[in-house]
Amino acid sequence: MAVYTSVSDEEVSSFLDLYPDSGRLLSIKGITEGVENSNYLITTDVRSYILTLYEKRVNPEELPFFMALTDHLAAENLPVPKAWKSRDGKQIQTLAGRPACLIEFLQGRWTPTPNAEQTRATGEMLGKMHKSLTHFSENRKNSLDLENWHILAEKCGFEAMNQIEAHMGDEVKKELDYLDKFWPKDLPRSVIHADLFPDNVLFEGDSLKGVIDFYFACTEVRAWDLAITYSAWCFDQEDHFLADHAKALIKGYHQSFALTEEERAAFIVLLRGAALRFLLTRAWDWVNTPPDALVVPKDPRDFFKRLRFYREASLESLGF
């Protein structure tokens, strides 16, 4: 979450009037974390909300898909924030020239250093979402799939990546060739979250209270979602592999939705694809963010290390 578009108290008060029983505005607080949209914590005399203004990286035409997705998951009693409907039944409005939604506020906070039990709970929740999404009929193309990794790598420049870390660009080129040959495109597909990092999961203690930020959700190889989550949760901030977290994540997932034998057999390839996807998007930001920018780009070398780790790993060493 972040703040790019400013709004006044008067604008927010008028916006709240569009919604029944929304209450009288008491406070507005910008949420500075994240990079995609502008987000505010809105407090009224009735309840709290998240006000989201969608910035240029989000296609307004895709917002109904995201609303339908979170509505579906929330209707199945999963802790996902749904968008409130205005008096005329609309979830998407306009505020300060941007598409905007008033979104349910969930209790809890994210943790930068999740423990093994929190990781297990996240795996269990991901499995519950995957089970629910077996009967969700809408689709959205993955704009960051293998085809687009090639495009992104070319735009970044292989030599530019070599400047970030020795041999990074050379190894990315080889990895793309490998994934072209071995990507398991025939595995079961569904809508996936595609960005289930610790900052998108809310906890009170070890109790999981919410899953947020579905704006990368898309239709893709389902087990790749678990591979992304694995890559985000099973390494510490110094990029050391956390075997106890890995076992906990897989255990939690299997408590609610088991991998097939084919998914299990392909999991290392999926992990390599997960590492490459985030290496490339971070490399792009690293190369293209001006030195004086207020936003500090995330380091692509973290996922370069994970990619190298996965190349040498076995399923047994990964917690299976």
UniProtKB/Swiss-Prot annotation:
Q: What is its EC number?
A: 2.7.1.39
Domain of life (superkingdom) = Bacteria
Query: Reaction catalysed by this chain?
Result: L-homoserine + ATP = O-phospho-L-homoserine + ADP + H(+)
According to UniProt, this protein's pathway is:
Amino-acid biosynthesis; L-threonine biosynthesis; L-threonine from L-aspartate: step 4/5
What keywords appear on the UniProt entry? Amino-acid biosynthesis, ATP-binding, Kinase, Nucleotide-binding, Threonine biosynthesis, Transferase
For this entry, list what GO says about its biological process.
Answer: threonine biosynthetic process
GO MF? ATP binding; homoserine kinase activity
Q: Which SUPFAM superfamilies match?
A: Protein kinase-like (PK-like)
Q: Does the keyword Kinase apply?
A: yes
Return the similarity comment. Belongs to the pseudomonas-type ThrB family.
Q: NCBIfam families recorded for this chain?
A: PRK05231.1, thrB_alt
Q: What protein am I looking at?
A: Homoserine kinase
Q: Which organism is it from?
A: Zymomonas mobilis subsp. mobilis (strain ATCC 31821 / ZM4 / CP4)
Q: Which gene specifies this protein's sequence?
A: thrB
